C-alpha cells in the first residue's frame, strides 16, 4: 500500500494513537477518532512527503498495520481451535464419514495453497530473496492507486473468509455423508512446477495423517502474501522504482486472483449440492418402513396425542369440580340459615304466627320436592316470656318496672333469639341509693340526742314531710320531679320494712292506739334505733355502767378468790424451796465436819462462825443468812446430835462454840 495514499479512517483508534506516538505527535488523552485523523493529516502526512523522514514514518506505519494483521490472524486461529475442540467432543461419526471429511479438508487446503502459490509465482525474485533473508519484517503494500489497493486486499480477505466458512461448516455438520465428494480440478489453476511438487508431498502426507483444525488453521495462517520492506534507508528513487514494480505485479496478479475466486465458489456450490443429496437420501431411508410398523407408530402417536390432550382437560375438570364442591359447602349452609331465620321470625310467639311463603314454583316442579324437605325443619312457635306483652314478628313489650333483654348470642339480630323481661336495674339502684341515704340520716339524728337513748321522737327522729323536702332538693340534675316522686314511694315502703326503723303517725290517741287515717295524706314520723354513729364517750358511759350494775358483785367475789389462791400457792412454793435449801446446807455442813476430822494435820473441829461463813458465802442478804443458819443449825442439832460433839473454846478472851464429828 502506498503510504502517501493511506486513508487514516480505515485504521483503528489504537493504531492511530500508536502512529502518532511513534512520530512524536502530541494529542489529548480523551481524543476521539476524528481528532486523531485530523492530527494524522496535519503532522504525519507532511513527514511522509518530506524525503529525510519518510522511511521512519513508513516503518512506524508498517509496524502498526502488521501488528493489527497479526492480532486478526491470531483471533481467527483461536476461534478455529475452539470450534474444533467443541466439535471433536460432540462427534461420534463412522469411519466412512471421517474419510470423506479428510478428503474435503485436503481439497480445501490444496485450493488455498494453489491460490497463494500463484500469487507468489507472479511476484519478483528480488522480493523472494528478501523474504528469505528477513521473514519477520512487516509486509509492504505495492504502490498503486487507493482504489486498486483496497480492491486487492478486499478480494484476498474475502477468499480467506470463504475457506474458513467451509471449514466451519464441515466441523459443525453432524450428518453422515454417504458418497465421497469429487476433488477440485486443479489443472484449471495456473501454478508453477515447484508448487506442484510441494502440493504432491502435502497430499501424500495427508493420506497417512489425520489433520485436526489446529494444523489446518496454522497452515492457513502461514500461507499469506508477505511483502518485505527495504533493509536499509532507501532514497526517493528506490521507493519510486519499488512502487512501479509493485503496481505491475498487482496488475498481473488480479486476473489470477479472480480465477481462483471463481474456482472456490464452484467448489462451495458442489459441496452444498452434495450435502443436500446426502441428507435427502438419508431421510428417505429413515422414512422407509414396513406397513405394520407404520400403522403401529401411527396408532401409538395418536393415542399419545389423545392422552396429552385429555390430561389438561381432566385436570381442569377436577379443579372445577373441587371448586364447585367448596362453593356448595359454603353457600348451602348460608342459604339454609337465611331460610330458617325468615321462618323463625314469621312463626314468632304462639298465637301470633304469620302465614308462611312456599318455595315451590309452578314452572319448576323440582322446587316442590325441595319445599317438602324443608318443611321438616320448620321451627315451632315460642311461648311468651314472663312479664311480657308479645306480638307478631317476635316483638315483645315488658310490664312497668321491667325492660326487654336480648340473648348474648343474638349478634345484633342476625340470629333471631327470643327476648325476655328483666327488672329495670337502673331504677332499683336509684331507689336503693335513696333508701341508704335516708337511713343514714336517721341514724345520725338519733345519735345526736342522749347517746341514742332519747324518748322524744321529734328530737331523735324526723317527719316524712321534712325528709321529702331534704332529699327532693338534693336529687341529681338529670332526675325529674316525677321520677323522684315514684322513687320516694318505694323508699317509704322499704323503710317501713326495716327492723331498726320506728315509724308512727302524727295523729294518734293518748292511750297509744292508732287511729284510722281519715285521708291518704297521713304524715308519719320516722326514727332509727341504731347506735352506729354514737360517740365513744357515750358508749363507755353507758356500757360500763350497765356492766357494773349487772355483773359487779360476782366480779368482785371472783377476783378475791383468785387472789387468795395465788397467795396460798406462792406460800407453799416458798416453803418447799426453803426446805430444799436447808437440806442442802445440812448435808454440806456434815461433809465439812467429816473432812476436818479426817485431816490430821489440822484441828479436828470447826467453829460455828467458820461453818456459817463457808456455807452461806453466796447469799448477800444478812437477814436471809441468819434465817437460813438458824434453821440449818436447829435441824443439825435435832437430827445429828449423837454424832456431833459440842463444846466451848476460849481464844484471846473470846468464847467460841465448836463442833466436832464423832467417829
Swiss-Prot record:
<comment type="subunit">
    <text>Interacts with SRP1.</text>
</comment>
<feature type="compositionally biased region" description="Polar residues">
    <location>
        <begin position="47"/>
        <end position="62"/>
    </location>
</feature>
<keyword id="KW-0539">Nucleus</keyword>
<dbReference type="GO" id="GO:0034399">
    <property type="term" value="C:nuclear periphery"/>
</dbReference>
<feature type="short sequence motif" description="Nuclear localization signal">
    <location>
        <begin position="124"/>
        <end position="137"/>
    </location>
</feature>
<dbReference type="InterPro" id="IPR011015">
    <property type="entry name" value="LEM/LEM-like_dom_sf"/>
</dbReference>
<keyword id="KW-0597">Phosphoprotein</keyword>
<feature type="compositionally biased region" description="Basic residues">
    <location>
        <begin position="124"/>
        <end position="134"/>
    </location>
</feature>
<keyword id="KW-1133">Transmembrane helix</keyword>
<dbReference type="GO" id="GO:0071763">
    <property type="term" value="P:nuclear membrane organization"/>
</dbReference>
<dbReference type="InterPro" id="IPR041885">
    <property type="entry name" value="MAN1_winged_helix_dom"/>
</dbReference>
<feature type="region of interest" description="Disordered">
    <location>
        <begin position="46"/>
        <end position="188"/>
    </location>
</feature>
<feature type="compositionally biased region" description="Basic and acidic residues">
    <location>
        <begin position="91"/>
        <end position="123"/>
    </location>
</feature>
<feature type="transmembrane region" description="Helical">
    <location>
        <begin position="317"/>
        <end position="337"/>
    </location>
</feature>
<dbReference type="InterPro" id="IPR018996">
    <property type="entry name" value="Man1/Src1-like_C"/>
</dbReference>
<dbReference type="Pfam" id="PF12949">
    <property type="entry name" value="HeH"/>
</dbReference>
<feature type="compositionally biased region" description="Basic and acidic residues">
    <location>
        <begin position="164"/>
        <end position="183"/>
    </location>
</feature>
<keyword id="KW-0812">Transmembrane</keyword>
<dbReference type="InterPro" id="IPR044780">
    <property type="entry name" value="Heh2/Src1"/>
</dbReference>
<dbReference type="GO" id="GO:0005635">
    <property type="term" value="C:nuclear envelope"/>
</dbReference>
<protein>
    <recommendedName>
        <fullName>Inner nuclear membrane protein HEH2</fullName>
    </recommendedName>
</protein>
<feature type="region of interest" description="Disordered">
    <location>
        <begin position="267"/>
        <end position="289"/>
    </location>
</feature>
<keyword id="KW-0472">Membrane</keyword>
<dbReference type="GO" id="GO:0005637">
    <property type="term" value="C:nuclear inner membrane"/>
</dbReference>
<dbReference type="Pfam" id="PF09402">
    <property type="entry name" value="MSC"/>
</dbReference>
<dbReference type="GO" id="GO:0003682">
    <property type="term" value="F:chromatin binding"/>
</dbReference>
<dbReference type="InterPro" id="IPR025856">
    <property type="entry name" value="HeH/LEM_domain"/>
</dbReference>
<feature type="modified residue" description="Phosphoserine">
    <location>
        <position position="123"/>
    </location>
</feature>
Amino acid at each position: 500500500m502506498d503510504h502517501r495514499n493511506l486513508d487514516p479512517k480505515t485504521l483503528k483508534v489504537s493504531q492511530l494513537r500508536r502512529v502518532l506516538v511513534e512520530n512524536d505527535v502530541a494529542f489529548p488523552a480523551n481524543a476521539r477518532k476524528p481528532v486523531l485523523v485530523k492530527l494524522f493529516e496535519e503532522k504525519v502526512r507532511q513527514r511522509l512527503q518530506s524525503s529525510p523522514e519518510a522511511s521512519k514514518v513508513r516503518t512506524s506505519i508498517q509496524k502498526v498495520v502488521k501488528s493489527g494483521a497479526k492480532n486478526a490472524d491470531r483471533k481467527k486461529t483461536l476461534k478455529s481451535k475452539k470450534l474444533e475442540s467443541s466439535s471433536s467432543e460432540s462427534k461420534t461419526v463412522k469411519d466412512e464419514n471421517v474419510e470423506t471429511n479428510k478428503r474435503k479438508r485436503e481439497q480445501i487446503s490444496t485450493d488455498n495453497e494453489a491460490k497463494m502459490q500463484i500469487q507468489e509465482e507472479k511476484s519478483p525474485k528480488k522480493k523472494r530473496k528478501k523474504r528469505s533473508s528477513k521473514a519477520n519484517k512487516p509486509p509492504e503494500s505495492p504502490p498503486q492507486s487507493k482504489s486498486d489497493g483496497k480492491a486487492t486486499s478486499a478480494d484476498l480477505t474475502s477468499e480467506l473468509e470463504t475457506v474458513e466458512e467451509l471449514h466451519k461448516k464441515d466441523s459443525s455438520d453432524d450428518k453422515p455423508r454417504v458418497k465421497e465428494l469429487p476433488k477440485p480440478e486443479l489443472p484449471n489453476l495456473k501454478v508453477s512446477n515447484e508448487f506442484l511438487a510441494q502440493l504432491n508431498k502435502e497430499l501424500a502426507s495427508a493420506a497417512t495423517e489425520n489433520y485436526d483444525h489446529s494444523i489446518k488453521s496454522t497452515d492457513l495462517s502461514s500461507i499469506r502474501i508477505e511483502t518485505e520492506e527495504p533493509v536499509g534507508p532507501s532514497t526517493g528513487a528506490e521507493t519510486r522504482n519499488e512502487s512501479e514494480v509493485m503496481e505491475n505485479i498487482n496488475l498481473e496478479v488480479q486476473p489470477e486472483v479472480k480465477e481462483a475466486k471463481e474456482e472456490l465458489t464452484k467448489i462451495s456450490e458442489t459441496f452444498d449440492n452434495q450435502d443436500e443429496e446426502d441428507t435427502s437420501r438419508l431421510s428417505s431411508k429413515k422414512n422407509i418402513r414396513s406397513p405394520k410398523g407404520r400403522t403401529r407408530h401411527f396408532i401409538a402417536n395418536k393415542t399419545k396425542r389423545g392422552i396429552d390432550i385429555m390430561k389438561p382437560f381432566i385436570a381442569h375438570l377436577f379443579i372445577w369440580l373441587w371448586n364447585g364442591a367448596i362453593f356448595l359447602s359454603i353457600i348451602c349452609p348460608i342459604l339454609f340459615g337465611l331460610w330458617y331465620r325468615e321462618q323463625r321470625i314469621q312463626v314468632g310467639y304462639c298465637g301470633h304466627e304469620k302465614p308462611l311463603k312456599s318455595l315451590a314454583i309452578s314452572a319448576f316442579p323440582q322446587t316442590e320436592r325441595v319445599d317438602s324437605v324443608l318443611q321438616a325443619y320448620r321451627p315451632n312457635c315460642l311461648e311468651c316470656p314472663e312479664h311480657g306483652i308479645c306480638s307478631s314478628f317476635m316483638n315483645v313489650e315488658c310490664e312497668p318496672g321491667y325492660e326487654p333483654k336480648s340473648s348474648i348470642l343474638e349478634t345484633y339480630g342476625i340470629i333471631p333469639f327470643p327476648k325476655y323481661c328483666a327488672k329495670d336495674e337502673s331504677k332499683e339502684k336509684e331507689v336503693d341509693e335513696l333508701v341508704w341515704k335516708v337511713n343514714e340520716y336517721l341514724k345520725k339524728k338519733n345519735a345526736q340526742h342522749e347517746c341514742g337513748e332519747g324518748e322524744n321522737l321529734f328530737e331523735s327522729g324526723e317527719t316524712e314531710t321534712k325528709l321529702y323536702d331534704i332529699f327532693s332538693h338534693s336529687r341529681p340534675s338529670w332526675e325529674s320531679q316525677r321520677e323522684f316522686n315514684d322513687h320516694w314511694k318505694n323508699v317509704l315502703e322499704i323503710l317501713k320494712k326495716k327492723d331498726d326503723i320506728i315509724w308512727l303517725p302524727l295523729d294518734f290517741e293518748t292511750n297509744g292506739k292508732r287511729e284510722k287515717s281519715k285521708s291518704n295524706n297521713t304524715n308519719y314520723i320516722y326514727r332509727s334505733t341504731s347506735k352506729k354513729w354514737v360517740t365513744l364517750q357515750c358508749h363507755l358511759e353507758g356500757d360500763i355502767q350497765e356492766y357494773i350494775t349487772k355483773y359487779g358483785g360476782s366480779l368482785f367475789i371472783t377476783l378475791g378468790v383468785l387472789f387468795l389462791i395465788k397467795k396460798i400457792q406462792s406460800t407453799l412454793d416458798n416453803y418447799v424451796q426453803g426446805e430444799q435449801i436447808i437440806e442442802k446446807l445440812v448435808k454440806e455442813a456434815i461433809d465439812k465436819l467429816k473432812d476436818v476430822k479426817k485431816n490430821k494435820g489440822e484441828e479436828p473441829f470447826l467453829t460455828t462462825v467458820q461453818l456459817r461463813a463457808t456455807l452461806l458465802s453466796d447469799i448477800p442478804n444478812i437477814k436471809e443468812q441468819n434465817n437460813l443458819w438458824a434453821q440449818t443449825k436447829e435441824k443439825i442439832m435435832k437430827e445429828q446430835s449423837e454424832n456431833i460433839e459440842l463444846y466451848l473454846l476460849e481464844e484471846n478472851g473470846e468464847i467460841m462454840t465448836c463442833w466436832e464429828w464423832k467417829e
